[in-house]
Regions:
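A short, Lys/Arg-rich alpha-helix, primarily the initiator
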Residues: 1-15
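Short, charged amphipathic recognition helices of the HTH superfamily
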Residues: 14-24
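C-terminal target-recognition/interaction regions appended to catalytic cores
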Residues: 21-22, 29-32, 277-407
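Recognition helix of helix-turn-helix/homeodomain-like DNA-binding domains
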Residues: 27-42
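DNA major-groove recognition helix of helix-turn-helix/homeodomain DNA-binding modules
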Residues: 45-60
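Core alpha/beta nucleotide-donor-binding catalytic domains of modification enzymes
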Residues: 56-179, 189-193, 198
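Class I S-adenosyl-L-methionine
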Residues: 123-130, 142-309, 313-315
């Protein structure tokens, strides 16, 4: 298969090693490593054995009571939420190399990270069987999707024509082939109004009418769990009818939600403080826009505040969320604070590993991520109905109820 993962890449990913760490382990040059990586040279002998042993040592031991796949995985926010209720990830797809590094550092796996999802939607048998599909696919207008006049002859033929060329199409292809018991899709709130509402309408039509799933959606804000105003839409689908009612799920009140001070580090490197030049520029830029009646501008937050939405552009100047420093210029959030703001770690919990990539890349990754406690909430909300759905399935998964019955 074009673009298929080589043995070298698969094993060093399974072992949780970067390219450089892998070639140091097997004691070969970079040029030899690149040949292994591209498939031009065959990995064999002692080098193969060393990587196999390293990969075997890192295989996750917990089987999980259901199997899920993680598409457009980013740095694993959806995964963390569904591992929380006892799921086991059996396949990951993420094209960005830096996100792959962060993901690999934080998830000990016995499977590699697939790159371009199109090779898997074209050959869905490459994806293992699973009960749940998770996907945070990018938002794209279907009005721009390429439709072949020769094939359509002026008529629509379901999602193959309506969504061709978009990443939702690849997701739909995989759902259509594997028919998982359930799926959870995540996107920005504006998906509902994107392209005049056409995008969301088409997605729901494809999922309900073309794929035959029972689908509901809901926008949930992150404020009850983290000190950030971040709204995201979650689309939940079950293959068979259930009593799940997304609109009836009780979301905690944001009134008693955490404040910014709860996630701030005590000792912060001065490099995160804005330069005098940048701070003056941002202040002048804000005044200019306010005079013109625009709302754009930098925002400074104190320890008792809840921030705006962290975006992937945060690395540029940090203007959307600046931390007040009495007696000094404000500062950016640190990457560690971004991890906490997105719920990837708790202050006294297990640290989220932030190595091998630059601050710029980490800001982008967290700005594109989901808020983990929100995903945990969604996962816990559908868990009883997922157990119900899987009780009729005849795979190797054992639900918590079955596990208890079996002693």
């Amino acid at each position: 298969v074009a673009g298929a993962i080589t043995t070298f890449t698969r094993l060093h990913q399974q072992a949780g090693l970067s390219f450089d760490e892998a070639i140091r382990l097997i004691e070969v040059s970079k040029s030899t490593g690149y040949r292994y990586q591209s498939g031009k040279s065959e990995l064999k002998g002692p080098a193969l054995k060393l990587l196999q042993e390293a990969a075997a040592a890192r295989i996750a031991e917990t089987p999980g009571w259901f199997r899920f796949i993680d598409l457009f995985a980013g740095i694993g926010g959806l995964r963390k939420g569904f591992e929380h209720i006892g799921g086991r990830c059996v396949f990951t797809s993420e094209w960005d190399a830096n996100s792959q590094k962060t993901y690999r550092n934080n998830f000990p796996d016995n499977h590699p990270i697939g790159g371009d999802i199109r090779q898997y939607s074209e050959n869905p048998d490459l994806i293992p069987t699973h009960n749940v599909l998770l996907a945070g696919f990018p938002c794209q207008p279907f009005s721009l999707a390429g439709v072949s006049k020769k094939n359509s002859l002026g008529r629509k033929h379901g999602f193959l024509d309506e969504t061709q060329g978009t990443l939702f199409f690849d997701t739909a292809q995989i759902i259509a082939h594997h028919r998982p018991a359930a799926f959870v899709l995540e996107n920005v709130k504006n998906l509902e109004s994107h392209d005049g509402g056409k995008t969301f309408k088409t997605i729901m039509k494809v999922l309900r009418e073309d794929l035959g799933y029972h689908v509901q959606s809901r926008v949930i804000s992150s404020e009850p769990w983290v000190p950030q105003k971040r709204q995201r839409i979650f689309i939940v689908g079950f293959r068979e009818p259930t009593d799940f009612d997304f609109s009836a799920v009780q979301v905690p009140s944001a009134r008693n939600g955490p404040k910014l001070g709860s996630i701030l580090e005590k000792d912060v490197d001065p490099k995160y403080t804005l330069s005098k030049k940048l701070w003056e520029y941002l202040q002048n830029y804000k005044k200019k826009h306010e005079a013109a009646g625009n709302g754009f501008g930098c925002s400074v937050f104190g320890p008792n505040d809840v921030t705006r939405t962290l975006s992937q552009r945060y690395y540029k100047d940090g203007s959307e969320i600046l931390v007040a420093q009495p007696g000094s210029r404000p500062r950016r959030l640190t990457p560690r604070e971004c991890a906490r703001l997105m719920g990837f770690e708790e202050v006294d919990g297990t640290p989220f590993i932030l190595k091998d990539v630059s601050d710029t890349q980490l800001y982008r990754q967290f700005g594109n991520a989901v808020v983990v406690p929100v995903v945990k909430f969604v996962a816990a909300s559908i868990m009883p109905y997922l157990i119900q759905a899987l009780s009729a399935e005849t795979d190797d998964c054992e639900t918590p109820r079955q596990r208890a019955a079996n002693g």
